[in-house]
């Protein structure tokens, strides 16, 4: 049966995902940045209360995946922290200036991760040559690759995802970006073994007082009084679709 991973941005969201049938959580901060490394406090609280596998993302900033020496040092330190806290896996990825896997740096990450299952995230979708990259990731011992098939959403990239799945002895190919209940059957019919979804929505803040003339973001039009949360009903619906597909 296909595995359902839910992207979560808080302990509360991780618990919601767990309660509604998620098989695994990718734990992140900063949804508007596409997911950054969670704080130590969030990591510890999730480790204590969530019982399904949780894989934190290790990504020090938004934007591309070519990092300075200081950023890479932080990545290694965060990898060690996640390992010390007892998480079963993590999510990360580093490219060089030419859009190839930065093999020396990824080798250091794999050494720091030790026995943890490492997912190479959507840095894959920004690489120059996906098949060469997949070969490099196989050589590194990467457990899985999260990809939209190098398109803006995974449904558009499904043909590339199927091509990657057919690659012999490669890591697990996990489809992500825009995967929802309404299109999930396309991925299941294509033989995708793992799917990744945020299964969420923006929720209004409970604050009654609101200073509408102030933004805490560099985006002056950002809504400071909303937060991204996992929709438990959406998770349960996706899990049900997977189970019914398996029963066919």
From Swiss-Prot:
Disulfide bonds: none annotated. Belongs to the CutC family. Homodimer. The lineage of its organism: Bacteria, Pseudomonadati, Pseudomonadota, Gammaproteobacteria, Enterobacterales. GO terms for cellular component: cytoplasm. One of its GO terms (molecular function) is copper ion binding. Keywords: Cytoplasm. InterPro entries: CutC-like, CutC-like_dom_sf. The keyword Nucleotide-binding does not apply. Pfam families: CutC. It is found in: Cytoplasm. This is PF03932 family protein CutC.
């Amino acid at each position: 049966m296909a595995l359902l991973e839910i992207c979560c941005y808080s302990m509360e969201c991780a618990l919601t995902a767990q309660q509604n049938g998620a098989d695994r959580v990718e734990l992140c901060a900063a949804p508007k940045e596409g997911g950054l490394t969670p704080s130590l406090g969030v990591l510890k609280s999730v480790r204590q209360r969530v019982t399904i596998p949780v894989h934190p993302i290790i990504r020090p900033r938004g934007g591309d995946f070519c990092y300075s020496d200081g950023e890479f040092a932080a990545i290694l330190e965060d990898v060690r922290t996640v390992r010390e806290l007892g998480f079963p896996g993590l999510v990360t990825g580093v490219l060089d200036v030419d859009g190839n896997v930065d093999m020396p740096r990824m080798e250091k990450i794999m050494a720091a991760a030790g026995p943890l299952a490492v997912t190479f995230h959507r840095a894959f979708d920004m690489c120059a040559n996906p098949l060469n990259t997949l070969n490099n990731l196989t050589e590194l011992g990467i457990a899985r690759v999260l990809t939209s098939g190098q398109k803006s959403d995974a449904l558009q990239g499904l043909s590339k995802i199927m091509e990657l799945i057919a690659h012999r002895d490669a890591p697990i190919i996990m489809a992500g970006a825009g995967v929802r209940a309404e299109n999930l059957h396309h991925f299941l019919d294509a033989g995708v073994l793992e799917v990744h979804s945020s299964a969420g929505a923006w929720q209004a803040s409970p604050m009654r007082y609101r200073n509408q003339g102030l933004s805490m973001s560099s985006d002056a039009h950002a809504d400071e009084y909303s937060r991204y949360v996992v929709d438990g009903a959406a998770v349960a619906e996706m899990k049900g679709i997977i189970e019914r597909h398996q029963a066919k």
